[in-house]
Amino acid sequence: MLMGQSVGEGSQLLLNSLFVIAALVFFAIVVQVSDNLMAIEAKRIGADKAGHHFGLVPRMHELFETKLPSYLKNERVISSKKGFDIPLEGEATKEKLEVSALRFAINPTNFRGISPIPKVLVEVGDSVKAGDPVFFDKARPELIFSAPVSGEIVEIRRGEKRAIHEIVILADKKQMYRSFDKPDLKTASREDLVTSLASSGLMTFFLQRPFNTAPDLDIIPRDIFISTFDSAPLAPDLAFALNGQDVAFQAGIDTLGKLTSGKVYLGLDGRGETDTSSVFTGVTGAEKVYFRGKHPIGNVGVQIHHVKPIAPSDKVWTINAQDVVMIGKFMLEGKVVQSRTLAITGAPLNKTGYVTLPIGVSVSDLLQSESVSENLRIISGDVLSGTQVTKDGFVGFYDDQVTVVEEGNQYELFGWLLPLDMRPSVSKTFPGTLLGGVPSAANTNNRG
């Protein structure tokens, strides 16, 4: 009798378990079908473009993710949990510095995809105006590289196999600009705009992906991407650099919109508690996407990957935010003003800040107030992707930052192993990670 009772209780328990399982499966199916139907409806009415999840229950990661600032509500936001920010000492203070520079250069080796020995149109002793052609690519004669300043050609530096490294210009005290006919953006065709921008040298500010080369003027890019912030160590604040340039930036965006068959994408900084500059947020004619995360989230290539990856047959163009302003000024004024606001950074410097100068400024002129010893390294760009230059060199064509760091001449026994000081650590094996990213003074040692 006891055995029969046990069998009956076991059967009842099994039936109850099967009932519970069936109920859970049924509930899961209902939730899944409802989620799918809500997602389809959200896509139909366009409500999914802000990147929100639509469903009966929140996803697991939504229960624990950081709450977004209020300005990001109803915006398309892409968040990345990967990456690493390297906090360094020597950030540029929000102050405009006055620097008097006389020597500038344009360097053909800064451009990928062109002949190492382009066709040079000037000689030592020639006078040029800002915007005059200096050289062009032999394979693509329509791709012209123009002078950033007016002045005298004082030197043409060559490297191995007579490859041209730098064409140096001694700038006039009063700048003279080559005059161009202003295209009418409302009536000009795409071909007219490309011809006008190419003749002025402004097409060289675009980079073509994949491979990050000088643009092919015979193709129409699928899309054009612009990152309005940089997440690299000690990177410049582009919102500060472009403060007050709303009109020129909008004119540049309008021009870019006619150069592509697709869209102009604007990558905005969504990492802060307050919105970025109105120079960027007030733009029309571009699709805005906010990005949150750690470096390299500000890299335009990372943004392309998240927004609309490049297919094998695709070609897209990218351009720096400051260069959009150059194009805008050209459309508004009919002259080429190749100037850029540089961030002067690095812990060894006595004074950091921002300076607005023509492209390709001499490093010795730029750092004339600093005592840069042999124990310091000068980098055109940031510490991760920049190029080492000497005081006799020039800032790179696409760079908007100069960084000075100590050479790693002090060697430590097992320096890569012993957690002796505060230093960044991806693996979180050093004590600096416990203090939430305390800035450290960088040097060139890899420490393993």
Regions found by a protein language model. Give the residues of each.
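Short coil-to-beta-strand transition motifs
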Residues: E142-S150
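Short, well-structured beta-strand-loop connectors
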Residues: V122-F136, E155
